[in-house]
């Protein structure tokens, strides 16, 4: 089976540090790439990791704070210089198009590909993207500006056919696709061979949720329930709880609480305030509530 | 004496590489900081080098290609978060204000400081900035879009007074500033003590020229003649001479030729095309013409 993986390009917050670039991550599912947020330096991080973005067609922007979108112009320009031809789709609030279009006209007026904007309603939990193998849903978040997270759901794959059974029952090739989808096989003699004898189930589809930036917000719990991996912001620790409320960010402990209540399998924290030079403290605070927490780090790939 | 120094934050060209960020450098003269170009990631490089930009008041943008200005929004946002209060002056072509203003309004509408735009006429060689210790002149360059380099000239400092002479002639304190500026001293008895006896000359003022991006362009030679340090772009090697002409860039050899003809003291090359993984080849090509050439490198400080 192909694995789903998440590569963190940047998991700092508003101010970059020596370790962390602003928010950006690359999700790879079934040979497709999805970019989630695009802070300054995203294309530089990709270059540092040797990421070829030739399977990247869709970018999802959570909200219009600079640390989540200032890398778009550089990335698009570079795609132009690489003579990209495939359409590039950007999913974001409507304002982004208004801000980027004049810049695209000025700096990239001879682009070799189209940039297509799709408007997200950040207040609604709804399907915003779908292809044959993946669905993406918006997750309304609670932040100072309109903001939403993203739930990526792999679709159920076809069942695995048991090769010996094809031979045993002499199943013709043209029948196989439907059997993989769960159909029984009827022999020439009219005998019904139940699908369960011919196939084994496919892997459980992967689910990944990205929740940044947000205050502690329990309304997301039913949406992200049981995901294989949750990336949740942990800008502050409990020592800065007042500031986290004011700025509508979460503490590491709160990220752990959300993970626990939603029964997720793994939590990755990130979007750390630049004030924390020792991020292990943030990890420990989240782990005290939710054991299977991982410290998000730039230039690192996580299996989902 | 305080030294003048140049810190290269990025000396890559349009496409970043593992080694090089896009164009940006910080010039420090007499305790002031000047930023020259501001490609994507400039603030990240500053952070990586521990540069505090609290003496930075003026930014000079050579031209409006993304790799020379996409870092401005991130830098300005961060200055805002740091509660900067000092005015920030940006010297660039008029179009930059039109492009940045809507972004500033959207992303930084509550900035704690003013951003002031100054228009450069890139076709003219003229004084574009002056304070008590430094003058900056534009240097018209030859590129696909309006573009100019910058000549930074330190002003002549006061002469050094010889302390023993103050005591010997009993020179009152209030006379000292004018003697430092070259005046003779007249004793109470009417004796004229020539300035040359009382003082020694100050250091020769430093001159630095930044020339990027540009085709080989001999018209800059009289302007940059004899500078202590010339940063000249060397996007290509002679093997890509046709491409360098098409794109109006220089080869390393041409950078060396300009340095030689202008009789500069030191040449730093940069703005390397991403195709050259071994930049020593570029250095050697320039050195074959102009021996005192230095390879520009990101995150490196050069004395001027």
Report each predicted region and the residues it spans.
Chain A
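General small-molecule cofactor/ligand-binding pocket signal
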Residues: 7, 91, 116-121, 137-139, ...
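Active-site neighborhood of divalent metal-dependent phosphoester bond hydrolases
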Residues: 84-88, 93-121
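Divalent metal-coordination and catalytic microenvironments
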Residues: 6, 37, 46, 63, ...
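Active-site neighborhood of phospho(di)ester-bond hydrolases with catalytic His/Asp-centered motifs
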Residues: 36-39, 56-64, 93, 208-214, ...
């Amino acid at each position: 089976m192909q694995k789903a993986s998440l590569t963190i390009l940047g998991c700092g917050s508003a101010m970059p540090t020596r370790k962390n670039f602003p928010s950006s991550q690359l999700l790879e599912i079934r040979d497709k790439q999805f970019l989630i947020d695009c802070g300054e330096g995203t294309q530089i991080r990709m270059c540092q990791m040797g990421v070829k973005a030739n399977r990247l067609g869709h970018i999802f922007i959570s909200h219009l704070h600079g640390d989540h979108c200032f890398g778009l112009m550089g990335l698009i320009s570079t795609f132009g210089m690489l003579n990209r031809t495939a359409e590039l789709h950007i999913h974001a609030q409507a304002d982004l198009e208004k801000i980027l279009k004049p810049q695209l006209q000025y700096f990239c007026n001879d682009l070799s590909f189209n940039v297509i904007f799709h408007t997200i309603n950040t207040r609604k939990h709804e399907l915003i993207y779908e292809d044959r193998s993946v669905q993406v849903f918006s997750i309304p978040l609670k932040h100072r500006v309109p903001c939403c997270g993203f739930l990526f759901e792999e679709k159920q794959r076809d069942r695995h056919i048991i090769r010996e059974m094809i031979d045993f029952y002499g199943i013709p090739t043209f029948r196989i696709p439907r059997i993989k989808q769960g159909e029984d096989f009827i022999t020439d003699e009219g005998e019904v061979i139940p699908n369960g004898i011919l196939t084994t189930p496919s892997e459980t589809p992967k689910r990944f949720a990205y929740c940044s930036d947000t205050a502690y917000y329990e309304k997301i719990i039913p949406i992200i329930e049981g995901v294989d991996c949750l990336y949740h912001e942990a800008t502050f620790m409990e020592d800065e709880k007042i500031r986290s409320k004011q700025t509508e960010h979460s503490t590491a402990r709160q990220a752990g609480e959300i993970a626990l209540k939603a029964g997720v399998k793994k939590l990755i924290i990130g979007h750390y305030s630049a004030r924390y030079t020792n991020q292990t403290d943030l990890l420990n605070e989240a782990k005290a509530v939710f054991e299977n927490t991982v410290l998000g780090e730039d230039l690192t790939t996580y299996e989902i």
